[in-house]
Amino acid sequence: MIPLHENLAGKTAVITGGSGVLCSAMARELARHGMKVAILNRTAEKGQAVVKEITAAGGTACAVAADVLDRMSLERAKEDILGQFGAVDLLINGAGGNHPDAITDVETYEEAGEGQSFFDMDERGFLTVFSTNFTGAFLASQVFGKELLKADSPAIINLSSMSAYSPMTKVPAYSAAKASINNFTMWMAVHFAETGLRVNAIAPGFFLTKQNHDLLINQDGTFTSRSHKIIAGTPMKRFGKPEDLLGTLLWLADESYSGFVTGITVPVDGGFMAYSGV
């Protein structure tokens, strides 16, 4: 168990997409360190299970409905959070995911191939995936940013991906959005550097989540060929576990540990990026 970061106690964290596999683990850990945690999802009900876990363990949390692509929805969520917790100290932009309309069925183009090709992808599906993963972080940062600037040691942590560095096959919209997240993280870090607001990102390696389950796990529960490629390309020879992200999360969230760190994206990937394949 990670030692408690006393500097985080009493502060408020807002987590978009907070009920997801990775972000819910972050929410529980931040609450363990004494932070008040607001879990944002399209419906408040999606976050209630995480809130119950946190409160049962003695922490403080609330579930709030918010659509990260709707500014007014985010504004209402902000007012709700301020009414309950009084401030915002940390924003984690974790909302994201994929959609079948923005995924090709084959890794490389085949003229006579079956299934959805690049030319078959639906524009609306592509834009929805890109917007959810990138524009949602932009809007949430705008809405909560003014409150963050009032805090003593504010921080934004964006969720990136291995696909930001070298785009994964099949998921062009997701890959483009995550590359944009890395760039936007650096832009915001410079823009707000003199205010004390630090902006960084975490790029998880390959973790099993609800969003990628069908790409990585067959119906019979075995690994897909894509999973086998991932494991072969990961020197630690396994998928990541949510708890693998928590040390990096706490380091970036706690100014006493990372007060001079801004504008970086930290890979937590079991060596995936370092491995050349030979």
Swiss-Prot record:
Q: Which domain of life is it from?
A: Bacteria
Question: Do you know which PROSITE patterns this protein is assigned to?
Answer: ADH_SHORT
Q: What induces it?
A: Induced by galacturonate, repressed by glucose.
Q: Which UniProt keywords apply?
A: Oxidoreductase
In its UniProt record, a GO molecular function of this protein is: oxidoreductase activity, acting on the CH-OH group of donors, NAD or NADP as acceptor
* Family statement: Belongs to the short-chain dehydrogenases/reductases (SDR) family.
Instruction: State the name under which the record lists this protein.
Output: Uncharacterized oxidoreductase UxuB
- The species is Bacillus subtilis (strain 168)
Gene, per the UniProt record: uxuB
